[in-house]
């Protein structure tokens, strides 16, 4: 069997890997694991990834669980164009520099609006207003750092061409954008960066990858989202409790 990718396009890192694979013609068997239903906490999936996280890549007996590691693995295995993960040592270090910062400052911050507006209400939990306000402040600060430190006067986050850094960043920022946050308003450099990345990826691929998250507010309003499993319910309560 070929490579299998376990994912849910509601998940930002799942979308990053999906887009990368599609853009580069990498053959993958897609296995959808419904996060809202809690399928990532099922016994069957935990046998594949005991962390219960998405995305997860299975290449024969080899299982890989972190999106940045998966992207690097696929880039090297399929020898994708050099701009994604440069062979030049310093250019590659810039990609890693961003990915390290991304894990600390972006990854846990920009996903919170989904918990506030969709996932919390789905299980009858309201995130306190002061936590929502702190999250907005944290997002604004992270956007400023993203713009000043990583983008600067360059066209892309790690240099003159699109890299894995841009893909990871775009997908994370799309999460609150899909929920109505005007992240790029008043930030012309970031808005132009987004336009360049999306133009490179192509409108059709972006629409394909983003269609589920872009419709999630409508699904929540119409009450058409699935009911989380008991295992997922407990995990969701714990995740909401960890919102700073």
From Swiss-Prot:
GST C-terminal domain spans which residues? 88-224
Protein's UniProt keywords contain tRNA-binding: no
Catalyses: RX + glutathione = an S-substituted glutathione + a halide anion + H(+)
Q: Which GO MF terms does the UniProt record name?
A: glutathione transferase activity
Q: Which InterPro entries match?
A: Glutathione-S-Trfase_C-like, Glutathione-S-Trfase_C_sf, Glutathione_S-Trfase, Glutathione_S-Trfase_N, GST_C, GST_C_Theta, GST_N_Theta, GST_Theta
Q: What is its main location?
A: cytoplasm
Q: Where in the cell is it found?
A: Cytoplasm, Cytosol; Nucleus
**A Gene Ontology biological process annotation?**
glutathione metabolic process
Q: Which UniProt keywords apply?
A: Cytoplasm, Nucleus, Transferase
Q: What does the entry list as the binding residues for glutathione?
A: 40-41, 53-54, 66-67, 104-107
| Cross-referenced PROSITE patterns | GST_CTER, GST_NTER
Q: What is this protein called?
A: Glutathione S-transferase theta-2
- What organism is listed for this UniProt entry? Homo sapiens
Lineage of origin: Eukaryota, Metazoa, Chordata, Craniata, Vertebrata
Gene from which this protein is expressed: GSTT2
